[in-house]
């Protein structure tokens, strides 16, 4: 017996406003301090995987593939909550970050180049 692959809950999918290439920006924040860690991109499947496993899963625009944060680096994100903004076009993913969130190894992607 072969069923169709799991899909994102239709009620959630209907509320998402995606970019033309089917993506939604995800702001990632440390759940207990409010520190903004990074911005990543999700499509319906990345969001479904994140909600199902509580392991932060994103779509890599440069590599054209899914990636689970920390799968190779060990710098994991355990998802505590996911919220949709009032317009339905941005996700807020609150996580418990282990290690650095940035690909450079820094704690956050927003601490290297302060403009003001």
From Swiss-Prot:
Q: What is its EC number?
A: 3.5.4.19
Binding residues annotated for Zn(2+), in chain numbering: 86, 102, 109
Keywords per UniProt: Amino-acid biosynthesis, Cytoplasm, Histidine biosynthesis, Hydrolase, Magnesium, Metal-binding, Zinc
Molecular function terms, GO-annotated:
magnesium ion binding; phosphoribosyl-AMP cyclohydrolase activity; zinc ion binding
Q: Where does Mg(2+) bind?
A: 85, 87, 89
- What Gene Ontology cellular-component terms does the record carry? cytoplasm
Recorded metabolic or biological pathway in which this protein acts: Amino-acid biosynthesis; L-histidine biosynthesis; L-histidine from 5-phospho-alpha-D-ribose 1-diphosphate: step 3/9
Q: Write down how the cofactor binds this protein.
A: Binds 1 Mg(2+) ion per subunit. Binds 1 zinc ion per subunit.
Location of this chain's protein in the cell:
Cytoplasm
Residues folding into a coiled coil are none
Classify the source by domain of life: Bacteria
Catalytic activity, as annotated: 1-(5-phospho-beta-D-ribosyl)-5'-AMP + H2O = 1-(5-phospho-beta-D-ribosyl)-5-[(5-phospho-beta-D-ribosylamino)methylideneamino]imidazole-4-carboxamide
Q: Which InterPro entries match?
A: PRA-CH, PRib_AMP_CycHydrolase_dom, PRib_AMP_CycHydrolase_sf
Family of the protein in this entry: Belongs to the PRA-CH family.
The protein's job, in short, is: Catalyzes the hydrolysis of the adenine ring of phosphoribosyl-AMP.
Q: PANTHER family of this UniProt entry?
A: HISTIDINE BIOSYNTHESIS BIFUNCTIONAL PROTEIN (PTHR42945), PHOSPHORIBOSYL-AMP CYCLOHYDROLASE (PTHR42945:SF11)
Report the protein name in the record.
Answer: Phosphoribosyl-AMP cyclohydrolase
- Annotated source species: Thermobifida fusca (strain YX)
Q: What is the lineage of its organism?
A: Bacteria, Bacillati, Actinomycetota, Actinomycetes, Streptosporangiales
């Amino acid at each position: 017996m072969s069923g169709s692959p799991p899909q994102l809950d239709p009620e959630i999918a209907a509320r998402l406003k995606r970019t033309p290439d089917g993506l939604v920006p995800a702001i990632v924040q440390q759940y207990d301090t409010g520190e903004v860690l990074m911005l990543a991109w999700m499509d319906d499947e990345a969001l479904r995987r994140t909600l199902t496993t509580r392991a932060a899963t994103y779509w890599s625009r440069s590599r054209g593939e899914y990636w689970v944060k920390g799968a190779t680096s060990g710098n994991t994100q355990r998802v505590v909550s996911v919220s949709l903004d009032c317009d339905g076009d941005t996700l807020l993913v609150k996580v418990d970050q282990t290690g650095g969130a940035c690909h450079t190894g820094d704690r956050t992607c927003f601490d290297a180049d302060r403009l003001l």
